Swiss-Prot record:
Organism field: Rattus norvegicus (Rat)
Gene that produces this protein: Fcer1a
Alphabetically ordered keywords of this record: Cell membrane, Disulfide bond, Glycoprotein, IgE-binding protein, Immunoglobulin domain, Membrane, Receptor, Repeat, Secreted, Signal, Transmembrane, Transmembrane helix
N-terminal signal peptide: 1-23
Domain Ig-like: 28-103, 113-181
UniProt main location, coarse: membrane
Protein name, as recorded: High affinity immunoglobulin epsilon receptor subunit alpha
Amino acid sequence: MDTGGSARLCLALVLISLGVMLTATQKSVVSLDPPWIRILTGDKVTLICNGNNSSQMNSTKWIHNDSISNVKSSHWVIVSATIQDSGKYICQKQGFYKSKPVYLNVMQEWLLLQSSADVVLDNGSFDIRCRSWKKWKVHKVIYYKDDIAFKYSYDSNNISIRKATFNDSGSYHCTGYLNKVECKSDKFSIAVVKDYTIEYRWLQLIFPSLAVILFAVDTGLWFSTHKQFESILKIQKTGKGKKKG
């Protein structure tokens, strides 16, 4: 019996199984283009499902407000958003777990504070902007956090918050002029939270590695013990042969 070949086969199977486990733990991810989770009626938005590099067509499942959609491609294009397009979106690429939900809010407002996220990881980033209905020009825009003005812009330009800290958590809104009429957006809360996924990723890497190491050590010990046992048997057989002689 080729014990060496069997052991190598077992080791290969374990490594393959670990690879499958790691792949299976990967989730699909929903992203928006443009990135705003708050949009106005009539806006165009594309939801993108990222998960793998599969070239297979119709390999994506979309779920909107717990109902499976007829859309099967990785890109779901909403040409002119309506209130009915609001809600929870989940996607699943073939061979991957379902994504975390993304919530899209379609609103009817004269002035809207748009944001790329409502929850941001510590040291992450997010964007905000003051947007008017039908893309009318907004002038003399002032951005507020917790009712305190922190940014003035003559035009409605994007504001990017990079390396966000817990101090960036708060309630945001904006004011601006539409045709010489001052308008105010509703308030929107953004929370900066601690990133626990880094610790989880380390665990994902450590446990499979430990399993492989333990298997290799166990296999090595088995071979060592097996060889010692064979040597003892040979010595015993040799001793018996000499006695008979």
